[in-house]
């Protein structure tokens, strides 16, 4: 459950380390986002010589949440921290590597590039 002003870790090598959600996309009344949802983020912390810099505004897809994700079989999966992958205008990842596991729900949302780059899909 990601709300506006929630801080997230970045799970790729785009150069950003921490981002803050500034808008949940998908309708004017939408207040929260979960795994697989696209949000608008502002880069709060970045490494030198990265592809993005502090203050940049990008779209991102949520790949891990600390709030449990319920599945159809009754199981739930949760992570220690919230994490996102930054996207460009064509909804493709900015980075070329993904760090840490991602959830299977991304496959249904057509984020195949992220699924293929991830070291583990849970």
UniProtKB/Swiss-Prot annotation:
Stretches that traverse the bilayer: none
UniProt keyword terms in alphabetical order: Ribonucleoprotein, Ribosomal protein, RNA-binding, rRNA-binding
Domain of life (superkingdom): Bacteria
Cited Pfam families: Ribosomal_L14
CDD domains reported in the protein's UniProt record: Ribosomal_uL14
InterPro entries: Ribosomal_uL14, Ribosomal_uL14_bac-type, Ribosomal_uL14_CS, Ribosomal_uL14_sf
Record-level Gene Ontology MF annotations: large ribosomal subunit rRNA binding; structural constituent of ribosome
SMART domains in alphabetical order: Ribosomal_L14 (SM01374)
A GO BP annotation: translation
GO CC terms in record: cytosolic large ribosomal subunit
Quaternary structure (record): Part of the 50S ribosomal subunit. Forms a cluster with proteins L3 and L19. In the 70S ribosome, L14 and L19 interact and together make contacts with the 16S rRNA in bridges B5 and B8.
Function field: Binds to 23S rRNA. Forms part of two intersubunit bridges in the 70S ribosome.
Similarity field: Belongs to the universal ribosomal protein uL14 family.
Identification of the protein by name: Large ribosomal subunit protein uL14
Organism of derivation: Gluconobacter oxydans (strain 621H) (Gluconobacter suboxydans)
